Amino acid sequence: MAEVFTNALKRSVGVVTTSSSGSIGANATTITGISTAAVAVGYLVDNGNFIGGAKVSVIGAGQVTVDSTSTNTSSTTTQTVNFVGLTTIYASTGQKSILIGGTLANNTTNQVSATVQVSSGSTSYNLLYKVPVPAGSSVVISDAGKTLLNASDEIRVGSSVAISLDVTLSILQGVA
């Protein structure tokens, strides 16, 4: 199979839902006392009590279950929790590919935080996590290195502010 360069482009990336009344138990996987409207399974949990990349795995009435344990050693209340939806920018077409590089451009007048993940099945890995992108500026992905993508991998991007980023990725498809 011949190698082919392609660009993956998305405009206005960013889906965010915020709840400011969360309760998180010590070393817990559940956040209670929150509104779950507009929250979806797979959304990132943005709160200082969970490691980067923690995701919503189950949604219940007024609570969510997270796929990792909280890091706090005692229960905490009135927590602000952001739920960040990831947008799939690139999905492999059944062949190995290489992420050559990319740019995240901030289209807003305020700084935003960007997250870029490679997802392989149900497992995701952060390429960038909560990287600040100044107002009217951009961040370059893989400036010095390349990232190999397996045949079923996806690249997903999230932002701390809704519809705030334009994303361009350069990808070499069909590598052996």
Segments predicted by a language model, with ranges:
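Short, well-ordered loop/turn sites that connect or cap secondary structure elements
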Residues: 38-40, 133, 149
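Beta-strand signatures of extracellular beta-sandwich domains
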Residues: 44, 115-117, 168-170
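Noncatalytic modules at the cell exterior or secretory-pathway interfaces
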Residues: 147-163
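Beta-sandwich interaction modules
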Residues: 136-152
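Short, surface-exposed beta-strand/strand-loop-strand elements in extracellular ectodomains
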Residues: 109-130
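Short proline/glycine- and polar residue-rich coil/turn motifs
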Residues: 58-60, 131-139
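Small/polar beta-strand repeat architecture
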Residues: 15-85
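C-terminal interaction-tip segments
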Residues: 1-14, 84-107, 159-176
